[in-house]
From Swiss-Prot:
<keyword id="KW-0472">Membrane</keyword>
<dbReference type="GO" id="GO:0006081">
    <property type="term" value="P:aldehyde metabolic process"/>
</dbReference>
<comment type="function">
    <text>Oxidizes medium and long chain saturated and unsaturated fatty aldehydes generated in the plasma membrane into non-toxic fatty acids. May have a protective role against the cytotoxicity induced by lipid peroxidation. Short-chain fatty aldehydes are not good substrates. Can use both NADP(+) and NAD(+) as electron acceptor in vitro, however in vivo preference will depend on their tissue levels. Low activity towards acetaldehyde and 3,4-dihydroxyphenylacetaldehyde. Able to metabolize aromatic aldehydes such as benzaldehyde to their acid form.</text>
</comment>
<feature type="lipid moiety-binding region" description="S-palmitoyl cysteine">
    <location>
        <position position="463"/>
    </location>
</feature>
<dbReference type="GO" id="GO:0030667">
    <property type="term" value="C:secretory granule membrane"/>
</dbReference>
<dbReference type="GO" id="GO:0070062">
    <property type="term" value="C:extracellular exosome"/>
</dbReference>
<dbReference type="GO" id="GO:0050061">
    <property type="term" value="F:long-chain fatty aldehyde dehydrogenase (NAD+) activity"/>
</dbReference>
<keyword id="KW-0449">Lipoprotein</keyword>
<dbReference type="GO" id="GO:0006979">
    <property type="term" value="P:response to oxidative stress"/>
</dbReference>
<feature type="lipid moiety-binding region" description="S-geranylgeranyl cysteine">
    <location>
        <position position="465"/>
    </location>
</feature>
<dbReference type="InterPro" id="IPR012394">
    <property type="entry name" value="Aldehyde_DH_NAD(P)"/>
</dbReference>
<dbReference type="GO" id="GO:0034599">
    <property type="term" value="P:cellular response to oxidative stress"/>
</dbReference>
<dbReference type="GO" id="GO:0046185">
    <property type="term" value="P:aldehyde catabolic process"/>
</dbReference>
<keyword id="KW-0488">Methylation</keyword>
<feature type="active site">
    <location>
        <position position="210"/>
    </location>
</feature>
<dbReference type="GO" id="GO:0005886">
    <property type="term" value="C:plasma membrane"/>
</dbReference>
<keyword id="KW-0636">Prenylation</keyword>
Length: 468
């Protein structure tokens, strides 16, 4: 008995039968996802609160609404995205039809994380279904309440001949990766991303890896400290800091640090009250393993704000660390929690040099009243995404691709980028079976005159020819 193998064979048979290709079928699956979100909103909010202590506001803004927006966008543009894309032609192909056809890969695997267990599961799923693929979904076993809904409720809204949910932990995921897929989409840590990529390489399966890293946040001396504090605190402590694009550390001068600390303290009190543990707006650490890891990081540098913790509640207070050394553990790993180290630099040049000697981050932030400073940080660094004078607001635009570079990942998605990620872009040229005299230039015996004429025909419209 091989239940998993049987499931994968069933899905492949459905794909090869052409079931997922029609626009009507794809639209029906997307509509089902939309109904799932609408009809189970409270159930999803409750599950997110149980798993991560997410407030209704955070759940709606960062999970349900974003997922619903992707569904709506895909439904509105599906037929336009599916259309063949006409391309320029050279003189030799003026009478032919040249286009790019967007084809589904086939059977795709989506492995989702626990920190945004709805958003980071459904947003890639929208792209995979819109592109006409059959999908195996592997939600995180760590966010167990959301996992239960995705396994038991979601399949009621989509065609189960083309969709399956696989449950389990690392062992089951490893078994899943032994099978051949046509595309793998993974969101998680760089360590596990390497395991996924190694497994995919055995079958030459293409992958998207949405990983993480240490996202820098540079703060210029000319900034208003309260404005910076408001924006940095909001996106550092959102979801208790368990966000892959959250700022992982602040780079600023000692003078700015002195102005920024009281502003951050004021903001944290305004956001979460005198007792943040009792605030309904502050999440909790997902499990004891992550809690213990984060509590150990509180010993790095010096605690300037916060630092309290409660193991029984998996609570870590919004914390700011100062006097942090570059080689301390808090600066050697992605924090993924409500802890914000401040690292002092003496100049913009030093900040840029500090950023560039580390792995390329998933996101990079620069605060300055000078647009030239922001543009200089943008120009002289590299990251998956960039935002000037705010936090992860670039994530709210489906018109911008989301993805990493280097150690923070490969590939991109959101909006049409998701559709393109899950589509094979097939180069197509349809020629006439007649008019053979027009092809005589390319046949032997060749001559200098024929060569000149052929090159002219091939180079028209700026095209070139590559023969492998």
């Amino acid at each position: 008995m091989d239940p998993l193998g049987d499931t994968l064979r069933r899905l492949r048979e459905a794909f090869h039968a052409g079931r997922t290709r029609p626009a009507e079928f794809r639209a029906a699956q997307l509509q089902g996802l939309g109904r799932f979100l609408q009809e189970n909103k409270q159930l999803l909010h409750d599950a997110l609160a149980q798993d991560l202590h997410k407030s209704a506001f955070e759940s709606e803004v960062s999970e349900v609404a974003i997922s619903q927006g992707e569904v709506t966008l895909a439904l509105r543009n599906l037929r336009a995205w599916m259309k063949d894309e006409r391309v320029p032609k050279n003189l030799a192909t003026q009478l032919d039809s040249a286009f790019i056809r967007k084809e589904p890969f086939g059977l795709v695997l989506i492995i989702a994380p626990w920190n945004y267990p709805l958003n980071l599961t459904l947003v890639p799923l929208v792209g995979a279904l819109a592109a006409g693929n059959c999908v195996v979904l592997k939600p995180s076993e760590i966010s167990k309440n959301v996992e239960k809904i995705l396994a038991e409720v979601l399949p009621q809204y989509v065609d189960q001949s083309c969709f399956a949910v696989v449950l389990g932990g690392p062992q089951e995921t490893g078994q899943l990766l032994e099978h051949r897929f046509d595309y793998i989409f993974f969101t998680g840590s760089p360590r596990v991303g390497k395991i996924v990529m190694t497994a995919a390489a055995k079958h030459l399966t293409p992958v998207t890896l949405e990983l993480g890293g240490k996202n820098p946040c540079y703060v210029d001396d000319n900034c208003d400290p309260q404005t910076v504090a408001n924006r940095v605190a909001w996106f550092r402590y959102f979801n208790a800091g368990q966000t892959c694009v959250a700022p992982d550390y602040v780079l600023c001068s000692p003078e700015m640090q002195e102005r920024l600390l009281p502003a951050l303290q004021s903001t944290i009190t305004r956001f979460y009250g005198d007792d943040p543990q009792s605030s309904p707006n502050l999440g909790r650490i997902i499990n004891q393993k992550q809690f213990q890891r984060l509590r150990a990081l509180l010993g790095c540098g010096r605690v300037a704000i916060g630092g309290q913790s409660d193991e029984s509640d998996r609570y870590i207070a919004p914390t700011v660390l100062v006097d942090v050394q570059e080689m301390e553990p808090v600066m050697q790993e992605e924090i993924f929690g409500p802890i914000l180290p401040i690292v002092n630099v003496q100049s913009l040049d030093e900040a840029i040099e500090f950023i560039n000697r580390r792995e390329k981050p998933l996101a990079l932030y620069a605060f300055s009243n000078s647009s030239q400073v922001v543009k200089r940080v943008l120009t002289q660094t590299s990251s998956g995404g960039f935002c000037g004078n705010d936090g992860f607001m670039h994530m709210t635009l489906a018109s911008l691709p989301f993805g990493g570079v280097g150690a923070s990942g490969m590939g991109r998605y959101h909006g049409k980028f998701s559709f393109d990620t899950f589509s094979h872009h097939r180069a197509c040229l349809l020629r006439s079976p007649g008019m053979e005299k027009l092809n005589a230039l390319r046949y032997p015996p060749q001559s200098p005159r024929r060569l000149r004429m052929l090159l002219v025909a091939m180079e028209a419209q700026g095209c070139s020819c590559t023969l492998l």
